[in-house]
Each structure stands twice: as C-alpha cells, then as structure tokens.
C-alpha cells in the first residue's frame, strides 16, 4: 500500500483533519473523495482502509455504511472501551455524571467534554458497561 498523505492542518477531537470549503467545515478525506468521485450518498461514510484519520490519500479511502465502519473497527481491534474511550473521563467520573442533577452543559464544562458527550453518557449510548 502507498504511504498515507497526512493532513497537517487543524484536526478535531477524534484526530480527523478539518478545513473550511465554501463556508462549510469539512474533513479533508471526504472532500478529496467527493472532488474525485462526486457526492457521497446520504447515509454513507468515507472510510480509511489505512486506519489513519489524518490520511487523505484517495487510494486509502472507500465508501461504507456506519455499520461497515463500526464492524471494521471491531475486526481490527480499534474500538475503544471504558476508560480508553475518553482520556478525559474515568469510570468514577461517569458514575458521578449519571448521579448528578447538574445540567448537561454544566457537567460538560465541569469535566471538560462536550454537552453531547454528557448526553450520550446519560442515554447509555457510551459507557454502557458501567
């Protein structure tokens, strides 16, 4: 396989590149895919066969469903669990978040994570094993 072409600009919290194109924040790997092959269909994601979120080498990109992407992560042993899921939170933090009466916003500020992260914890979409 050819070497990755790594994005050297800004990245998001998950390590994916990000850039502005026509007033919209996009990931470089999706942008290069769409520039090469056209729009990605709704409900489809651009996957990295190299498992490098900063890579935008068109030869390392393929389309799949979110389920395909999740199965690929599990097959390759890249699906984080527990405290590996977020370096910012521990299991005791999650238990405290679930028992708190503070707002999602306040909890996010307190623990240094997004409000949506707090929501996913409270809805047991993440940290389900606790």
UniProtKB/Swiss-Prot annotation:
Gene3D superfamilies in alphabetical order: Homing Intron 3 (I-ppo) Encoded Endonuclease, Chain A
Source domain of life: Viruses
InterPro entries for this protein: His-Me_finger_sf (IPR044925), HNH_nuc (IPR003615), Homing_endonuclease_His-Me (IPR044930)
Pfam families: HNH_3
Gene Ontology MF, one: endonuclease activity
Annotated protein name in UniProt: Protein 7.7
Species assigned in the record: Escherichia phage T7 (Bacteriophage T7)
Phylogenetic placement of the source organism: Viruses, Duplodnaviria, Heunggongvirae, Uroviricota, Caudoviricetes
């Amino acid at each position: 396989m050819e070497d990755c072409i790594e994005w050297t600009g800004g990245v998001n919290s998950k390590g994916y590149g990000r850039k502005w194109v026509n007033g919209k924040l996009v990931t470089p790997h999706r942008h290069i895919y769409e520039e090469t092959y056209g729009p990605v269909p709704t409900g489809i994601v651009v996957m990295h066969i190299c498992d490098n979120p900063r890579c935008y080498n068109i030869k390392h990109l393929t389309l799949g469903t979110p389920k395909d992407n999740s199965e690929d992560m599990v097959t390759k042993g890249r699906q984080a669990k527990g405290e590996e899921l977020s370096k910012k939170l521990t299991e005791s933090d999650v238990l405290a978040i679930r028992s708190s009466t503070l707002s999602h916003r306040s909890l996010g500020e307190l623990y240094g994570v997004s409000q949506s992260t707090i929501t996913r914890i409270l809805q047991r979409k993440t940290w389900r094993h606790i």
